[in-house]
């Protein structure tokens, strides 16, 4: 999922628009139990080929383990990256942002945890069984001097109903609210902002899970809806 905007209300910039090719990519963490075509060793060359073919300007990536990140660093030499590894385990709770180093320079970076207690600590939020994170970078386009913020996240997924509702839906909804609050504090209300992520929520109209993204849609525009015709699709693939 990719969303973008300054704000969904007043304050829209009148500056000339620049094109930005953005990719959100859950790479599927390298799991020893994945066999055959699902194994990372079977997928890694195709992953690099796909990125080289699509040529995204910025990538929001979810789940790259250390070994995967090291491989990609060696192969994606045209990109710089910010790789978030907030624990000392080689877990799937790792996110990254990649950007074309010939086009952009990074001005700032940071991250926070998605929970209701202390966003500086790896606390499991809203009764969930895993901690989740969001990371961000501030980039400047070298040719124009334009600056923007890019956030990337991976929202809750467990599919465990609890009394009073789905704990996943609660965690996703509250996480989105928190991310939007942090966007406003870090970037301000009218700075250009992009957010990508594995939202673990359906985009389909009428699907109740979509409501957890309301906080994003109230603050931003959907890049899917504003993309040129034919450049956004609903094709599923295996990482």
Name each model-derived stretch.
Residues 52-56, 69, 73-78, 103, ...:
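Sec-exported extracytoplasmic/periplasmic mature domains
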Residues 81-100, 116-119, 125-131, 190-193, ...:
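Active site of divalent-metal-dependent phosphoester/diester hydrolases
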Residues 3-75, 87-93, 177:
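N-terminal, active-site-proximal structural segment of metallo-dependent hydrolase catalytic domains
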